[in-house]
């Protein structure tokens, strides 16, 4: 078992979860290699590749992370708004925040890392090999790059869930409702819109009209059990794992790759810096993912043209 051991307690499994440092006592390990040629030999032989991606991938497309210094929207940190309690207390304010994030994403494009992953997935698929993307990001940039086999473990900015009937539905409207048009500016001096709840996004199912919420994982919420089951299955069968642009300090995704490594599967980390999990991996490639990942995933000389 991989994922089920990592089922986190209530309050620690959000896509905006505060950084939780891994507290294992790592045994003495060999320093990870940065030998791209050696990695490429593993890549050429792999039949089932799992690629775990985090905020670092999207950051290279200019997507705000709302983490660390300056990670504010108006005067609030993301964790102030990304909770069921905040939505219950002030759905207008929370929807302004998510409307802003949705609109920002319309100007962002997949970067070379997204495109390299999508091209690799398509190419290896034609060879009877598989690539699966397990992403902590909620921006759908992997989909826009052309990736097909994507698990969005923290949900999507472009899906909604009805608070009444529970329907989950893709929603790419801009604005998502008329009352939010022009709202959501991030400037701290911006006046709150205070939109009446009946004018916020509503369910379109006949006879429902329930209040919609963003279909993302908030503080105090657990991840979707069906998605975790599928992720567990993918991680158990993979014979090569890449960890791309993730800090490895947020649960449960922080433990995915280390547990894959614990069964002897090569794991390669692509990140701007070392992480608490780096010493557990066979490879570490430091630098922008958009620069380090494409040459790692390009066609190998052993592949048929």
From Swiss-Prot:
<feature type="binding site">
    <location>
        <begin position="136"/>
        <end position="139"/>
    </location>
    <ligand>
        <name>NAD(+)</name>
    </ligand>
</feature>
<feature type="binding site">
    <location>
        <position position="289"/>
    </location>
    <ligand>
        <name>NAD(+)</name>
    </ligand>
</feature>
<dbReference type="GO" id="GO:0070403">
    <property type="term" value="F:NAD+ binding"/>
</dbReference>
<dbReference type="GO" id="GO:0036049">
    <property type="term" value="P:peptidyl-lysine desuccinylation"/>
</dbReference>
<feature type="binding site">
    <location>
        <position position="203"/>
    </location>
    <ligand>
        <name>Zn(2+)</name>
    </ligand>
</feature>
<dbReference type="InterPro" id="IPR026590">
    <property type="entry name" value="Ssirtuin_cat_dom"/>
</dbReference>
<feature type="binding site">
    <location>
        <begin position="245"/>
        <end position="247"/>
    </location>
    <ligand>
        <name>NAD(+)</name>
    </ligand>
</feature>
<dbReference type="Pfam" id="PF02146">
    <property type="entry name" value="SIR2"/>
</dbReference>
<dbReference type="GO" id="GO:0061697">
    <property type="term" value="F:protein-glutaryllysine deglutarylase activity"/>
</dbReference>
<dbReference type="InterPro" id="IPR029035">
    <property type="entry name" value="DHS-like_NAD/FAD-binding_dom"/>
</dbReference>
<keyword id="KW-0539">Nucleus</keyword>
<dbReference type="InterPro" id="IPR026591">
    <property type="entry name" value="Sirtuin_cat_small_dom_sf"/>
</dbReference>
<feature type="domain" description="Deacetylase sirtuin-type">
    <location>
        <begin position="33"/>
        <end position="303"/>
    </location>
</feature>
<feature type="binding site">
    <location>
        <position position="101"/>
    </location>
    <ligand>
        <name>substrate</name>
    </ligand>
</feature>
<dbReference type="InterPro" id="IPR027546">
    <property type="entry name" value="Sirtuin_class_III"/>
</dbReference>
<feature type="active site" description="Proton acceptor">
    <location>
        <position position="154"/>
    </location>
</feature>
<keyword id="KW-0862">Zinc</keyword>
<dbReference type="GO" id="GO:0005739">
    <property type="term" value="C:mitochondrion"/>
</dbReference>
<dbReference type="GO" id="GO:0036054">
    <property type="term" value="F:protein-malonyllysine demalonylase activity"/>
</dbReference>
<feature type="transit peptide" description="Mitochondrion">
    <location>
        <begin position="1"/>
        <end position="32"/>
    </location>
</feature>
<dbReference type="GO" id="GO:1901363">
    <property type="term" value="F:heterocyclic compound binding"/>
</dbReference>
<dbReference type="InterPro" id="IPR003000">
    <property type="entry name" value="Sirtuin"/>
</dbReference>
<dbReference type="GO" id="GO:0008270">
    <property type="term" value="F:zinc ion binding"/>
</dbReference>
<dbReference type="GO" id="GO:0005634">
    <property type="term" value="C:nucleus"/>
</dbReference>
<keyword id="KW-0809">Transit peptide</keyword>
<dbReference type="GO" id="GO:0005759">
    <property type="term" value="C:mitochondrial matrix"/>
</dbReference>
<feature type="binding site">
    <location>
        <begin position="271"/>
        <end position="273"/>
    </location>
    <ligand>
        <name>NAD(+)</name>
    </ligand>
</feature>
<keyword id="KW-0496">Mitochondrion</keyword>
<keyword id="KW-0479">Metal-binding</keyword>
<keyword id="KW-0520">NAD</keyword>
<dbReference type="GO" id="GO:0010566">
    <property type="term" value="P:regulation of ketone biosynthetic process"/>
</dbReference>
<dbReference type="GO" id="GO:0036048">
    <property type="term" value="P:protein desuccinylation"/>
</dbReference>
<dbReference type="GO" id="GO:0036047">
    <property type="term" value="P:peptidyl-lysine demalonylation"/>
</dbReference>
<keyword id="KW-0808">Transferase</keyword>
<dbReference type="InterPro" id="IPR050134">
    <property type="entry name" value="NAD-dep_sirtuin_deacylases"/>
</dbReference>
<dbReference type="GO" id="GO:0036055">
    <property type="term" value="F:protein-succinyllysine desuccinylase activity"/>
</dbReference>
<dbReference type="GO" id="GO:0005829">
    <property type="term" value="C:cytosol"/>
</dbReference>
<feature type="binding site">
    <location>
        <begin position="54"/>
        <end position="73"/>
    </location>
    <ligand>
        <name>NAD(+)</name>
    </ligand>
</feature>
<feature type="binding site">
    <location>
        <position position="165"/>
    </location>
    <ligand>
        <name>Zn(2+)</name>
    </ligand>
</feature>
<dbReference type="GO" id="GO:0017136">
    <property type="term" value="F:histone deacetylase activity, NAD-dependent"/>
</dbReference>
<keyword id="KW-0963">Cytoplasm</keyword>
<comment type="function">
    <text>NAD-dependent lysine demalonylase, desuccinylase and deglutarylase that specifically removes malonyl, succinyl and glutaryl groups on target proteins. Has weak NAD-dependent protein deacetylase activity; however this activity may not be physiologically relevant in vivo.</text>
</comment>
């Amino acid at each position: 078992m991989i994922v089920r051991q990592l089922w986190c307690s209530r309050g620690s499994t959000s896509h905006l979860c505060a950084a939780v440092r891994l507290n294992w006592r790592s045994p003495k390990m060999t320093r990870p290699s940065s030998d791209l040629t050696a990695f490429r030999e593993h890549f050429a032989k792999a039949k089932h590749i799992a690629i775990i991606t985090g905020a670092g991938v999207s950051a290279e497309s200019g997507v705000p992370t709302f983490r660390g210094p300056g990670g504010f929207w108006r005067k609030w940190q993301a964790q102030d708004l990304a909770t069921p309690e905040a939505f219950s207390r002030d759905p207008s304010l929370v929807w302004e925040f998510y409307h802003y994030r949705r609109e920002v994403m319309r100007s962002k494009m997949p970067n070379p890392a997204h495109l390299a992953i999508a091209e690799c997935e398509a190419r290896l698929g034609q060879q009877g090999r598989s690539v699966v993307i397990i992403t902590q990001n909620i921006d759908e940039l992997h989909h826009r790059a052309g990736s097909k086999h994507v698990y969005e473990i923290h949900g999507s900015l472009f899906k909604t869930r009805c608070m009444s009937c529970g329907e989950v539905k893709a929603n790419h409207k801009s604005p998502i409702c008329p009352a939010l048009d022009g709202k959501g500016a991030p400037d701290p001096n911006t006046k709150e819109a205070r939109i009446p709840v009946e004018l916020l996004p509503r369910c379109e199912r006949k006879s429902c009209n329930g209040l919609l919420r963003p279909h993302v994982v908030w503080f105090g919420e657990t991840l979707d059990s069906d998605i975790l089951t599928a992720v567990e299955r993918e991680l158990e069968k993979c014979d090569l794992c890449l960890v791309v642009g993730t800090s490895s300090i947020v649960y449960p995704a922080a433990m995915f790759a280390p547990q894959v490594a614990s069964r002897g599967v090569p794991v390669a980390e692509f990140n701007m810096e070392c992480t608490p999990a780096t010493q557990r991996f066979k490879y570490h490639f430091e630098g922008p993912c958009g620069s380090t990942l494409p040459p790692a995933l390009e066609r190998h000389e052993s592949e048929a043209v």
